Amino acid sequence: MKKTLSIHSVRKDLILGSRRLSNYWWATIIFIGALGFLLAGLSSYFQVDLLPFTNSTDLVFIPQGIVMTFYGSIGVFLSLFLWLTIIWNIGAGYNEFNKDKGIVKIFRLGFPGKNRKICLQFNIKEIKSIKIDIKEGLNPRREIYLCTKDKRVIPLTRVGQPLLLSEVEEQAAEIARFLDVVLEGA
């Protein structure tokens, strides 16, 4: 939740999707590495030097060339998947809390298809609390959840790099204060 648009009775938190610098970095690095493996494997098969900075024709096609071609193909498909998630901006959206209309709207973009746009809408009266879930350790998790009276728990924070503890606490407190509900800790 990076940007917040707030007018006295409407609060809108924008959620960053897959268009993060780290995703651009990994998609590019994986593509370059995979392309190198693929070209080295194909060079050993065709006995033509497709990589200008090395002599890949000395590789024996079976087993080294086949393995390099296989790993290169898998890497190219993985980087293609990463680039498509960046282009489609998977996970982007917003959390809108509207006191005038009495609704909470959670909107996210998914993969193309009939369910590309995911929109959850709740009446503010259905909201029981805002919950903070903090797990420290090797893989830390710091998330904010919207808890409804019918026991549903909906995540409000973005996926990816965990927010600072102070940011999570501050955002959760602001949302709970805005909605006039209880703030829970896990």
Curated annotation (Swiss-Prot):
Membrane topology: Multi-pass membrane protein
GO biological process: photosynthesis
InterPro entries per UniProt: PSI_Ycf4_assembly (IPR003359)
Keywords: Chloroplast, Membrane, Photosynthesis, Plastid, Thylakoid, Transmembrane, Transmembrane helix
Pfam families: Ycf4
TM region positions: 26-46, 66-86
GO cellular component: chloroplast thylakoid membrane; photosystem I
Protein name: Photosystem I assembly protein Ycf4
Organism, as annotated: Pyropia yezoensis (Susabi-nori)
Upper lineage: Eukaryota, Rhodophyta, Bangiophyceae, Bangiales, Bangiaceae
